[in-house]
């Protein structure tokens, strides 16, 4: 029996907090869409040439690209795949957020790397870089796709599978984001309930 493919979004969620894949995939609880989420989704424009930094010169841009790989165990829809004038393939993702003058967070870089790996698998071409476009501040960031990040993604896939198979929540991280995270009301109760059950045994 083939394993169900993990959505690439789970990679991003895992690097934000490993509790979320547990809640989504084991407890089958997903954060309900808020008005701002719906508004953001409805206004989410397609990736265009003007979203690219100058060093990426497009010959062709394909948007909403479905990708999947039983070998990697991943599937997802890439915002855009750019073929440059030199024949290079560059995966691109739009984020409805801002990063100011800082570097893209690990969760975004890991998700982009996962998409790059899917592109490599499907198109049989090596991907050396990708682009992250942040809609709120207009930042266009070229991100290198390296072996270190590829290994990190493979490890994350393996660990997410382990979480699902064990049906046990991973250890909580002490994140400042917990206070504003919708899932905090579930992950705290789920973890404490499970710990209580184990003590009873």
What are these regions (language model features)?
Residues 1-60:
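Charged, glycine-rich intrinsically disordered N-terminal tails and low-complexity linkers that flank
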Residues 4-11, 107, 169-176:
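Structural motif
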Residues 60, 120-201:
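Metal-dependent nuclease catalytic regions and adjoining charged, substrate-binding loops involved
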Residues 47-89:
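Active-site metal-binding core of divalent-cation-utilizing nuclease and nuclease-like domains
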Residues 3-4, 10, 104, 117, ...:
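Non-catalytic alpha-helical scaffolds and adjoining flexible linkers that form interface surfaces
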Residues 105-111:
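Short, conserved glycine- and acidic-residue-centered signature motifs
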Residues 17, 76-101, 113-117:
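Conserved catalytic cores of phosphodiester-cleaving nucleases, focusing on short active-site segments
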Residues 100-104, 141-142:
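A generic structural signal for short coil/turn motifs at secondary-structure boundaries
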């Amino acid at each position: 029996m083939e394993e169900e493919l993990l959505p690439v979004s789970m990679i991003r969620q895992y690097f934000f907090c490993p509790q979320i894949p547990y809640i989504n995939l084991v407890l089958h609880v997903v954060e309900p869409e808020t008005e701002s989420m719906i508004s953001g989704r409805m206004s989410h424009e397609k990736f265009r040439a003007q979203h690219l930094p100058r060093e990426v010169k497009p010959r062709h841009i394909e948007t909403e690209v479905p990708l999947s790989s039983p070998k990697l165990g991943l599937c997802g829809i890439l915002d855009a795949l750019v073929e440059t004038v030199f024949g290079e393939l560059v995966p691109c993702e739009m984020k409805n957020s801002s990063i100011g003058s800082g570097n893209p967070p690990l969760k975004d870089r890991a998700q982009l790397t996962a998409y790059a790996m899917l592109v490599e698998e499907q198109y049989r071409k090596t991907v050396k870089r990708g682009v992250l476009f942040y809609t709120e501040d207009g930042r266009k960031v070229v991100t290198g796709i390296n072996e270190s990040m590829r290994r990190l993604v493979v490890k994350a896939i393996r660990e997410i599978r382990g979480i699902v198979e064990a049906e046990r929540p991973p250890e909580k991280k002490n994140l400042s984001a917990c206070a504003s995270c919708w899932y905090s009301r579930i992950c705290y109760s789920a973890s404490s309930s499970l710990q209580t059950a184990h003590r009873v045994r």
